[in-house]
Curated annotation (Swiss-Prot):
<dbReference type="GO" id="GO:0006952">
    <property type="term" value="P:defense response"/>
</dbReference>
<dbReference type="Pfam" id="PF21354">
    <property type="entry name" value="STAT_linker"/>
</dbReference>
<dbReference type="GO" id="GO:0006357">
    <property type="term" value="P:regulation of transcription by RNA polymerase II"/>
</dbReference>
<dbReference type="GO" id="GO:0043565">
    <property type="term" value="F:sequence-specific DNA binding"/>
</dbReference>
<dbReference type="GO" id="GO:0042127">
    <property type="term" value="P:regulation of cell population proliferation"/>
</dbReference>
<dbReference type="InterPro" id="IPR008967">
    <property type="entry name" value="p53-like_TF_DNA-bd_sf"/>
</dbReference>
<dbReference type="Pfam" id="PF01017">
    <property type="entry name" value="STAT_alpha"/>
</dbReference>
<keyword id="KW-0010">Activator</keyword>
<dbReference type="GO" id="GO:0007259">
    <property type="term" value="P:cell surface receptor signaling pathway via JAK-STAT"/>
</dbReference>
<dbReference type="InterPro" id="IPR048988">
    <property type="entry name" value="STAT_linker"/>
</dbReference>
<keyword id="KW-0539">Nucleus</keyword>
<dbReference type="InterPro" id="IPR013801">
    <property type="entry name" value="STAT_TF_DNA-bd"/>
</dbReference>
<feature type="domain" description="SH2">
    <location>
        <begin position="477"/>
        <end position="574"/>
    </location>
</feature>
<dbReference type="InterPro" id="IPR015988">
    <property type="entry name" value="STAT_TF_coiled-coil"/>
</dbReference>
<dbReference type="Pfam" id="PF00017">
    <property type="entry name" value="SH2"/>
</dbReference>
<keyword id="KW-0804">Transcription</keyword>
<protein>
    <recommendedName>
        <fullName>Signal transducer and activator of transcription 1</fullName>
    </recommendedName>
</protein>
Length: 706
């Protein structure tokens, strides 16, 4: 059923489980009847011996006839039993293959896609139905756990049945035991993988953690309350520690390496580093970390001054180039009838994160993790290389989503905004543009005459909008991404005098007011005030600057035709009231900061206010479905073993004599002519390798289709 849908595979697996149930009942019944027949044959054998000893030859002949008929019946019964044993092996094998295909789809496709969407959501990509999708995935995990456990029980019961059965010299029972053992081992392997992969980070921590700041995250076990797992894990602690990303990658190669890493590797300290697994009303078995804090991080030390070993120096990373991960783990636990050596050792990793100790590191840390979230695979396969260059189209999607997420703005970047941004990154008048490298995007100066990169410039604008200009941006009062020359031309083409707000491209995190005024002869002259930074706007808000600037008093419109007074009314309560204030309790009278634009005499005010003269450049005033029974409902230690009473019925260990001798020559002839393993009964016992690394190597994530 390769290529079958998930629903088709689920139906097929459910049908196989039901068939295995019926076949188990038939095997149990047939073996019981066969044991009874052997018992009767043994009794008749003893009767014949006794009659022969008593010289009652006429009775011996009659009993031998009865024994011959009984031997024929027993041989036919054994043939039927052997066929049913073969049938259940085939069905268990089919069920295991169906479970393998379903598990591959579930973990390698559905859960993988969910995790990838979760990763992209951290840079603003929409993922509104994340809870619904995860609940649907949990239902599939629970279904697979139930089906696996049922198949496993039928296989274990059959093994116990065969070991109790009379052992004939044909070797068929031993061959069947070998196949059932292989099936059981594969089912256990699938179950271990299913449980371990069901432990996920349902709420990722922030991509950039700050020391001495709390972080919020949540882990969840998607296996839910199946297999009696609740009684093992509810109120069990989930621990968390921070490890280097290099160590996280090592775990993708060596699944067991986490034991050493979690016990010995320490790169930081987390307070409140454990929480209890609890089951909520929605059936989620989860642990929420709401009060954990990263109190210390051990950054790699920079190379010593004058270090001559360039290779060593090059391997050293700045603090903002180092990635980490949170490792979550549960104390190993045992479940059901599995051996003590087969404990569930469950752990999971967060997405890579950055750590900062100071606000000045935020810009560099944000871009490193942004690039990873957008373009890297969620698989920590050490054989895959990092994406170092992408097309502008992919970069534009990333910027648009990150902008909305970071600023919280309702108004997204428009196509014209992105076109303006592309001019900062692409070579002018070149048709065949090369991919944009991370270095060009985040490290290289935006222009030769500027000391900052494109990302530093864009990041500072996002900070400015978030902290000071969000209302201006959302209402469309801030044009923002437009060049000084284009702003001047646009304003001069308006029928009436106007002003606009644009972001400086020669200074980081600054907004400039551009305006056009008319001379007495009707000539329009554009002016651009020196840009205001966040620090400037802390001293006097942008709305107050616009309201108090003499040169803007007679300009009624913001470009293109927005009533200035309508805009200012939005800020009257929070700005003008704050500036006006009331009487001071100390007796002082309050003062007011007023912004004045120095237009160098090129503009004669139409009002009686005096002209303002000064420097050549205007400047701001301030500084810058299942069976009726479910194996998952039974949790005894010997849930896979038969009762003693049933075992006694099906066991012939105390039977004396050779079984083949009891069955007679007719049995041998029948068995010789019957081959339960001919070409019509061959079945495939080759299973998909569900190792973690192999699962993840099926996918190489691309942020956007090429």
């Amino acid at each position: 059923m390769m290529g079958s849908s998930s629903q088709e595979l689920q139906t097929a697996l459910t049908d196989v489980s039901k068939t295995c149930h019926h076949l188990w009942e038939e095997n149990k019944d047939l073996q019981g009847r066969f044991v009874n027949e052997l018992g009767e044959l043994q009794r008749l054998q003893m009767v014949i011996a006794q009659l022969e000893q008593q010289q009652r030859l006429e009775n011996v002949f009659t009993v031998k006839q009865q024994m011959t008929e009984l031997q024929k019946r027993a041989a036919t019964l054994y043939e039927h039993l052997t066929q049913k044993r073969n049938d259940i092996v085939i069905k268990l094998n089919d069920g295991t293959n169906f479970a393998t295909m379903l598990q591959t789809q579930l973990i390698g496709e559905k859960l993988f896609s969910w995790k990838n969407a979760q990763k992209l959501a951290q840079i603003g990509m929409p993922f509104d139905n994340r809870e619904q999708l995860l609940d649907e995935i949990q239902i599939e995990f629970e279904f697979l756990a139930d089906q696996n456990w049922q198949l496993n029980m039928f296989s274990c019961w059959m093994l116990d049945l065969l070991r109790r059965a009379p052992q004939l010299n044909d070797g068929l029972a031993q061959a069947t035991i070998g196949k059932l053992t292989a099936i059981t081992e594969q089912l256990n392997k699938l179950l271990f993988m299913l449980v371990s992969q069901s432990f996920i980070v349902s709420v990722q921590p922030e991509p950039v953690l700050k020391t001495q700041h709390k972080f919020v995250t949540e882990v969840r076990l998607l296996i839910g309350d199946k297999l009696g797992i609740r009684q093992h894990l509810v109120n069990t602690n989930v621990s968390v520690k921070i490890i280097a990303e290099d160590e996280a990658k090592q775990l993708s190669v060596d699944y067991d390496a986490h034991k050493e890493i979690r016990n010995n590797k320490t790169v930081g300290t987390i307070s409140n580093d454990f929480e209890k697994l609890t089951m909520n009303e929605r059936g989620h078995l989860a642990a929420k970390f709401n009060n954990s804090k990263l109190t210390r991080i051990a950054h790699r030390k920079p190379p010593p001054k004058g270090a001559s070993d360039l290779k060593c120096a090059a391997s050293m990373q700045a603090a903002t180039d180092q990635k980490y991960a949170l490792l979550f783990f549960i104390t190993p636990f045992q479940m059901g009838n599995l051996s003590k050596e087969e404990q569930f050792d469950v752990w999971t990793l967060s997405l890579p994160i950055m750590v900062t100790v100071h606000g000045s590191q935020d810009c560099d840390a944000q871009v490193a993790i942004l690039w990873h979230r957008a373009f890297a695979s969620i698989s920590r396969n050490p054989n895959t290389t990092d994406v170092t260059a992408v097309t502008w189209d992919n970069l534009a999607i990333m910027l648009r989503n990150k902008f909305s997420l970071f600023t919280g703005a309702r108004r997204p970047l428009s196509d014209s905004d992105l076109a303006y941004l592309s001019e900062k990154m692409l070579m002018p008048n070149v048709a065949d543009q090369k991919p944009i490298t991370f270095h060009r995007f985040a490290k290289q100066a935006m222009r030769d005459d500027l000391p900052f990169s494109f990302w530093e410039w864009f990041f500072s604008i996002m900070q400015l909008i978030k902290q000071k200009l969000l209302k201006f941006w959302d209402e469309g009062w801030c044009i923002g991404f437009i060049s000084k020359n284009d702003a001047s031309q646009s304003m001069m083409m308006c029928q009436h005098s106007s002003f606009l707000l644009r972001f400086s491209d020669s200074q980081t995190g600054a907004v400039s007011i551009g305006f056009v005024c008319e001379e007495a002869d009707g000539q329009k002259i554009p002016f651009h005030l020196a840009p205001f930074t966040i620090k400037d706007l802390d001293q006097l808000s942008l709305a107050s600057r616009i309201a108090s600037c003499p040169q803007l008093k007679d300009i009624r419109y913001m470009y293109p035709a927005i009533d200035k007074e309508e805009m200012l009314r939005f800020f009257e309560s929070e700005e003008r009231h704050r500036v006006g204030g009331g009487d001071s309790p100390t007796g002082y009278i309050q003062s007011e900061i007023v912004m004045v634009a120095k237009t160098n005499g090129n503009f004669r005010r139409m009002s009686n206010a005096p002209s303002m003269f000064g420097a050549d450049s205007p400047s701001p005033l301030s500084v810058q479905s299942k069976l009726d029974w479910s194996p998952g409902e039974v949790h005894q230690n010997h849930m896979m073993e038969m009762s003693d009473e049933l075992g006694q019925i099906l066991t012939v260990s105390d039977m004396s004599g050779d079984v083949e001798t009891l069955l007679g020559p007719a049995f041998k002839n029948n068995i010789t002519n019957y081959n339960p393993h001919d070409g019509n009964h061959q079945h495939n016992l080759h299973f998909v390798d569900m190792s973690q690394q192999g699962m993840m190597q099926q996918h190489h994530n691309q942020f956007y289709p090429s």
